[in-house]
Amino acid sequence: MTLKELVVGFATQVRSIWMIGLHAFHKRETQMYPEEPVYLPPRYRGRIVLTRDPDGEERCVACNLCAAVCPVGCISLQKAEHEDGRWYPEFFRINFSRCIFCGLCEEACPTTAIQLTPDFEMGEFKRQDLVYEKEELTISGPGKYPDYNFYRKTGVAIDGKSKGEADNEAKPIDVKSLLP
């Protein structure tokens, strides 16, 4: 070992100790998660829930838009119909082991039945436990939109006006006129 190698090795050791000394009293980056709550941004997308309307009925009308827009295909449902003609999902299933929490299902839902919550603690030991059924997804309240009721807003006639005559409403399209 030459004198030059000895000096370089010693300088390297001194520099390492100096760097440790500089960083020893800085604020730690590690979060003590279970003891301290984690800061989540206001628009954080976490666990998906199904909500109810203000009347207590489930909002989902089984339109299948959420399953169609899901890029990984983790949502599956089957439509059924009540005696009064209202649609509802006979089963609604989300496989959270495949879900990427993109939020497209929430945007596609016309009834605001699907909502993403800031809940992120979904760790399980078995993958089968990450498949949530309708009973596990449905919450008792309306979620982010407490006053919205799909069946009170859609399909309600406006007194004195026929279809296409209301403000900000387009004229109905005659689909048969578009055919070749």
Curated annotation (Swiss-Prot):
Reaction it catalyzes: a quinone + NADH + 5 H(+)(in) = a quinol + NAD(+) + 4 H(+)(out)
Membrane topology type: Peripheral membrane protein
UniProt cofactor(s): [4Fe-4S] cluster
Encoding gene, per UniProt annotation: nuoI
Binding of [4Fe-4S] cluster 1, residues: 60, 63, 66, 109
Cofactor comment: Binds 2 [4Fe-4S] clusters per subunit.
NCBIfam families per UniProt: NuoI, PRK05888.1-1
Entry keyword annotation includes Cell membrane: yes
Protein's job: NDH-1 shuttles electrons from NADH, via FMN and iron-sulfur (Fe-S) centers, to quinones in the respiratory chain. The immediate electron acceptor for the enzyme in this species is believed to be ubiquinone. Couples the redox reaction to proton translocation (for every two electrons transferred, four hydrogen ions are translocated across the cytoplasmic membrane), and thus conserves the redox energy in a proton gradient.
Subunit text: NDH-1 is composed of 13 different subunits. Subunits NuoA, H, J, K, L, M, N constitute the membrane sector of the complex.
Domain (4Fe-4S ferredoxin-type) ranges: 50-80, 90-119
Region of interest called Disordered, as start-end residue ranges on this chain: 160-180
An example Gene Ontology biological process: aerobic respiration
Keyword ATP-binding: no
PANTHER family, A to Z: NADH DEHYDROGENASE [UBIQUINONE] IRON-SULFUR PROTEIN 8, MITOCHONDRIAL, NADH DEHYDROGENASE UBIQUINONE IRON-SULFUR PROTEIN 8, MITOCHONDRIAL
Compositional bias (Basic and acidic residues): 160-174
Cellular component aspect of the GO annotation: plasma membrane
Sample GO molecular function, one term: quinone binding
Subcellular localization: Cell inner membrane
PROSITE patterns for this protein: 4FE4S_FER_1 (PS00198), 4FE4S_FER_2 (PS51379)
Protein name as annotated: NADH-quinone oxidoreductase subunit I
Entry EC number(s): 7.1.1.-
